[in-house]
Amino acid sequence: MSYEYDDELEEIRRRKMLELQRRLEEERRREEEQARLRAQKDAILRRLLTSKARERLANLRLVRPEIAEAAENAVIQLVQTGRITPPVDDDTLVQILLELDRSTRRDFEIRIKRK
């Protein structure tokens, strides 16, 4: 009886270990894919942006990574559609950032109801 119980426990442990290994492998693969995509995007942006614009974007990425990501995507899209031509300078990047800020800003109003 105890041998069966031990065998069942060992089988459960083995399955859990396999599941954990599978998850870790999947997470590692996902991280590698993200790193590969990041490297591709960085290479594209190096060709599209001036050094000052890249510096501004790097500083922004430290403080507001989601805004930096949106700006990177916007620059790539604008160049692909021909709306701006490379190299994208710092002034153009600032204009793109201002436009992103305007489009994502939420105005809200606080109302206080008194009884």
Curated annotation (Swiss-Prot):
Where does this protein come from, organism-wise? Answer: Aeropyrum pernix (strain ATCC 700893 / DSM 11879 / JCM 9820 / NBRC 100138 / K1)
TM region positions: none
Q: Which family does it belong to?
A: Belongs to the PDCD5 family.
**Which UniProt keywords are given for this protein, alphabetically ordered?**
DNA-binding
Cited InterPro entries: DNA_bind_arc, PDCD5-like, PDCD5-like_sf
Q: State the name under which the record lists this protein.
A: DNA-binding protein APE_1087b
**Pfam families for this protein:** dsDNA_bind
Q: Name one GO cellular component term.
A: cytosol
Q: Which GO terms describe its molecular function?
A: DNA binding
